[in-house]
Every structure is written in C-alpha cells, then in structure tokens.
C-alpha cells in the first residue's frame, strides 16, 4: 500500500461510516473494540496479569480532561502558539524539544491525551503513576515528567519501567 497509510485508513473509515450510517457504524466499532479488549485481557491473563479496571482513552476527550490539561498548561504559562499549532514548552523542564498539543488543524495530539490521563490519574486520588513502556519509547520518560511539572504535579510520583522482548535461541 503506497502513499500515506493514515490517510488511506482514514478514508476507509469515512467510507464505512457513510455506508453504514452513524448508528450502525458506532455499533460495529463498539463490537470490534469489545472483541479486541477481550483478546487483550485474555493475553494478559496468560501472563498472570489481571486488571480490576480498564480506562477508556475516549473518556479523556468526552469528560473534558484533555481540554482541562491544556487549559492548565496555558494558565501556568507553559503553552505558546506557532504556525497555527499550540506547543507545550517542554524544554523548560528538561525535554530536548517543545511538544505540539494541538495541531494546526485544531486536532489534539496523542501527547495531549497523555496530559489528560496524567491529570486524571492524580485527580482520582492515586499517589503515583506507573507506566510500562517498550524500550523504543524511552524518550517519553523526560516528556512525561516535563508534562507533570507543567501541570503542577510532582514528577517524582511518576515511575516508568522500560521493557524489551528478546528471543533466546
């Protein structure tokens, strides 16, 4: 599949939504989501990991957490606009570059969702946030701790473990 794969997938989704109608599309989407989550739970159970709660990333937007996190950064003076996008001044907190939170098209980034989740975690009364990342996401450590500082949270309350799979012959 040549070209921009994300645009291709977005086009397929748009066509499916148009052909099915909004209600049927949401039903098919939810069925697929439930199936995938069941598969993930089964895989994790095989590793001896059973969660009490799964958190929906979608709720970060629907509950206004992403918006609140961005507003908090703005209120704290840690956002600026450049080329139509909103940027978090992550370099003020030791990151190697500033990070986009709202693209020039008005859509929030995945990092903006991380901000909302981080805010939510501490608002729900947790005294620490534990993240487990693949080793290829090591750059996220400084970024996430910078985000905590920008939100007025204690970065020492964030613990990040890196894991890497290996094949042993």
Feature annotation, model-predicted:
Residues 1-169:
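NTP-dependent nucleotidyl-transfer catalytic core
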